[in-house]
């Protein structure tokens, strides 16, 4: 046993080099960057009958904000309308600040467009629900979003476009 341990201690390949070279990504902070709630037809809207039509749109962006620091922004726009008019409009920009170390560039985009939004979404969802409820409406719970599935669809669509660009059109 003692011989095995001393052999490991003397092996230069197993000695620490003082650097941490393993890939790491960490959430440093998350925050509401911008929040807007509009209730354009108050107080009449509270007397309207019928279920509103709710339209939800979202977008994801990632920007470098410093050395090994990236801000991932989840933008959610919700519009609720009835046949009498707009009930409410909410616009939320919810962001997360991520520290990145030793991650290959080809792995950053999948993280920023699939995994980071998945991490941020439950918190953004709560902000939307609270804002809608604070505006005098029943809390709006957004359905979960499969960010990974959406990212894979975008990748496949982009690959399809690249393949389609080189393919001949028509019959020869």
Curated annotation (Swiss-Prot):
InterPro entries documented for this protein: SecB, SecB-like_sf
A Pfam match: SecB
Taxonomic superkingdom: Bacteria
BP GO annotations: protein folding; protein tetramerization; protein transport
Biased composition (Polar residues): 7-20
Subcellular compartments: Cytoplasm
One cellular-component annotation, GO: cytoplasm
Signal peptide: none
GO molecular-function term, one example from the UniProt record: unfolded protein binding
UniProt keyword list: Chaperone, Cytoplasm, Protein transport, Translocation, Transport
Region (Disordered): 1-22
SUBUNIT field: Homotetramer, a dimer of dimers. One homotetramer interacts with 1 SecA dimer.
Family in the record: Belongs to the SecB family.
PANTHER family documented for this protein: PROTEIN-EXPORT PROTEIN SECB, PTHR36918
Role summary: One of the proteins required for the normal export of preproteins out of the cell cytoplasm. It is a molecular chaperone that binds to a subset of precursor proteins, maintaining them in a translocation-competent state. It also specifically binds to its receptor SecA.
Full protein name: Protein-export protein SecB
Annotated organism of origin: Sphingopyxis alaskensis (strain DSM 13593 / LMG 18877 / RB2256) (Sphingomonas alaskensis)
Lineage: Bacteria, Pseudomonadati, Pseudomonadota, Alphaproteobacteria, Sphingomonadales
Gene name as annotated: secB
């Amino acid at each position: 046993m003692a011989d095995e341990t001393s052999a490991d201690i003397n092996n230069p390949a197993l000695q620490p080099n003082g650097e941490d070279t393993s890939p790491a990504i960490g959430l440093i902070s998350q925050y509401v960057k911008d929040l807007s709630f509009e209730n354009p037809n108050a107080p009449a809207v509270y007397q309207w009958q019928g279920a509103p039509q709710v339209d939800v749109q979202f977008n994801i962006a990632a920007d470098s904000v410093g050395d090994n620091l990236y801000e991932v922004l989840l933008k959610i726009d919700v519009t609720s309308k009835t046949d009498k008019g707009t009930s409410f409009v909410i616009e939320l920009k919810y962001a997360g600040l991520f520290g990145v170390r030793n991650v290959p560039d080809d792995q950053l985009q999948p993280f920023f467009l699939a995994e980071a939004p998945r991490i941020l979404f439950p918190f953004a969802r709560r902000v939307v629900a609270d804002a809608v409820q604070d505006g005098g409406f029943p809390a709006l719970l957004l359905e979960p979003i499969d960010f990974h599935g959406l990212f894979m669809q975008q990748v496949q669509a982009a690959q399809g476009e690249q393949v389609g660009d080189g393919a001949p059109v028509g019959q020869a």
